[in-house]
């Protein structure tokens, strides 16, 4: 990996005599291979893909920057994101966070921090984001919409329907039900929803606890939307403790009828998993559709 050491020397703010002395592969990052780069004084987390042009990592860095600006939950500092100098592929270089076990206080801090993040409103009060980004490696359209119902239909459900069709994972009856749901969202999604800043891909693998017990958010797919959509995803695959939810509820209680919409919002993430991982997620998608449209 001498080429990576040379690339890192070009993009990192190294001191004149500072040399990268170690580059070790580590676990972390679902969209690329991950490494820790070390000098005698410092460490960085490096994630790269030889088959990407760097845009995925640029969008990740922009999402981290938005979360950092909000100041609600810590994020790693970004040192570089983009193409690899003089080589095909892309990479992102982040501050190395020494991880440790999550403490009770860590999960409570994450819950309070997410509540604070969700109080951050979009510029102009609209839903979406000023550019498209990615959820995993799937393109995620954004742009701006005046209502959450419009955004959820036009920028979330319908794009995934089209991607699923291309992958052969949208049989006729599933498509029919999904279109009926899109056409009747006003039955379940009320007016007056405020556009909260969302991490966008908050499963238990996209946050970590530092060795000091501080929660950090990683791998975002940010947009401004209904905070219930974010919280619904945290419940889809589990991994968040009751302390996390109690701290969130104390700081920013969810509406009493949130549970009516929870499966509706989990549907987007089930469609993402259907596209990425196959028909094993098809029955879960179908159960949600039957629940809402029969």
What are these regions (language model features)?
Residues 16-25:
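Conserved N-terminal boundary motif of the eukaryotic protein kinase catalytic domain
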Residues 84-107, 119, 138, 154-158, ...:
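A glycine-centered beta->alpha junction motif in the catalytic cores
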Residues 141-153, 162, 194-197, 204-263, ...:
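Active-site Asp-x-Gly
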Residues 2-15, 85, 122-197, 210, ...:
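An alpha-helical support segment within catalytic cores of ATP-dependent transferases
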Residues 24-150:
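ATP-binding pocket architecture of kinase catalytic cores
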Residues 65, 235, 266:
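A cross-family signal for key residues in well-ordered alpha-helices
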Residues 51, 84, 99, 158, ...:
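Activation segment
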Residues 57, 107-110, 174-178, 285:
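Hydrophobic packing residues in well-ordered alpha-helices of helical domains and bundles
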């Amino acid at each position: 990996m001498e080429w990576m050491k040379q690339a890192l020397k070009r993009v990192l703010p190294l001191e004149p005599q500072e040399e990268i002395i170690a580059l070790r592969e580590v676990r972390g990052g679902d969209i690329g291979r991950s490494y820790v780069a070390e000098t005698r004084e410092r460490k960085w987390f490096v994630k790269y893909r030889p088959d990407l042009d760097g845009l995925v990592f640029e969008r990740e860095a922009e999402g981290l920057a938005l979360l950092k600006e909000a100041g609600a939950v810590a994020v790693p500092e970004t040192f570089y994101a983009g193409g690899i100098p003089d080589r095909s592929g892309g990479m992102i270089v982040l501050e190395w966070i020494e991880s440790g076990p999550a403490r009770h206080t860590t999960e409570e801090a994450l819950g309070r921090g997410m509540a604070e993040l969700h109080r951050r409103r979009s510029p102009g009060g609209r839903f979406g984001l000023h550019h498209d980004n990615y959820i995993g490696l799937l393109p995620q359209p954004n742009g701006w919409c005046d209502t959450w119902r419009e955004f959820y239909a036009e920028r979330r459900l319908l794009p995934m329907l089209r991607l699923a069709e291309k992958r052969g994972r949208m049989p006729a009856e599933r498509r029919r039900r999904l279109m009926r749901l899109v056409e009747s969202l006003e039955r379940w999604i009320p007016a007056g929803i405020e556009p909260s800043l969302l991490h966008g891909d908050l499963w238990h693998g996209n946050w970590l606890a530092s060795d000091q017990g501080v929660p950090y958010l990683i791998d975002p797919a940010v947009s401004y939307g209904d905070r219930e959509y974010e919280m619904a995803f945290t419940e889809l695959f589990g991994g968040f403790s009751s302390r996390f939810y109690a701290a969130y509820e104390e700081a920013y209680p969810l509406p009493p009828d949130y549970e009516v919409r929870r499966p509706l919002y989990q549907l987007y993430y089930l469609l993402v998993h259907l596209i990425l991982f196959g028909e094993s997620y098809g029955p879960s998608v179908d159960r949600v559709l039957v629940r809402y449209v029969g």
